[in-house]
From Swiss-Prot:
One of its GO terms (biological process) is proteolysis. GO terms for cellular component: extracellular region. Residues 126-400 form the Peptidase S8 domain. This is Subtilisin-like protease CPC735_013700. It comes from Coccidioides posadasii (strain C735). Residues 20-116 form a propeptide.
Amino acid sequence: MGFVKILSLSLAATAVADAATILSPRYPNDVIPNEYIVVMKDGVSSASFASHSAWVADMHYYNHTKRALPGHGIQEVYDIYEMKAYSGKFDEDTIQRIAKEPDVAFIEPNQIVTISEISVQKAAPSWGLPRISVKENQLSSNTDYFYDSSAGAGIWVYVVDTGVDIKHPDFEGRAVWGTSTVDRSKTDRLGHGTHVAGTIASKTYGVAKAVKIIAVKVFKDRTTSYKNIIGGIDWAVKHSKKNNMLSKSVVNMSLGGGRSSAMNKAAANAHKTGMFVAVSAGNTPVDAMNFSPASEPLACTVAASDKDDMQAQFSAFGPAVDIFAPGTDIVSLVPRKKFGTKSGTSMAAAHVSGAGAYIMALEKIPGNEVCNRLKELAQSSIVRSSDKTTRKLLYNNSGK
């Protein structure tokens, strides 16, 4: 499956008197020891944040010098629209003192993230593109993809994933390297990010065949952590802002896991900048409200459909789902000039990111209006979905 899983946080929290909430892990053995994500309250000024960070650095240095303990302190700092946060490695005494600071909203332990196995079926038929360009299911007689020749030109898509093989010839030079929050390698070792990017923008299998892909690598193997993903979002927002592209940018996150306030807040604040944020619902057939960033209302949450316009057996569902898109046996790119087939809500989200970029270019609308527009255009075609789940299936408004 193409969905990236993350270990869950329980809804329970450790209450500290007159202090910020420290979320408690559901599976303690899966937490990265002494690593935390600290999120500040909305409205904290840059000056106050800088002062707080300096205080933490000084306190951490003093504590560890006094007790001769190794430690890293603050490692990464995030500033995503209204969200100010940082991650790092702290001992229990330090984190309890941080929690008592009045500007701190909540603290989460950093957790391991793992990517699930990906199935590959060579030479399988591609069907997602023709399906999203017609109102009625015509797959038995039609394999043509109908789209406007603008094809998303002028739109940037940040693929927050395992990396992208930017040299794959099917990208026609439109894929570029952005950053990595996990290592210095520009290689997509797993192929997941390349496949996702190919569905979004490749010449042969892409929904929006003229957009620019920017690779944001947050996985170096099958595990990563929340702080790496949030760091990728932070970089994408800053890069887009620097280039005056916020309202013309898409963030695709074909990943997720146990519900996380920090992850949701990062996704929400990316949306608030003007970007279109598309995320996968999850590859476990349960309520998507259990997952993040799928449970974030400002993210466009995508469930997977099959060739018969039914909810895919593996797809998450529920009121958090905004739209369905093709997600089973999807043919796209894999590294080293190859092609392959994968299934998952990751692939469904990629279709929506591509369609979002396409509509942004065609209708000249900002990214943070795109999810509602896609839902307006979508057809009530899903013939079998779970209770309280939309029946809306992605449609690119081709007129067919």
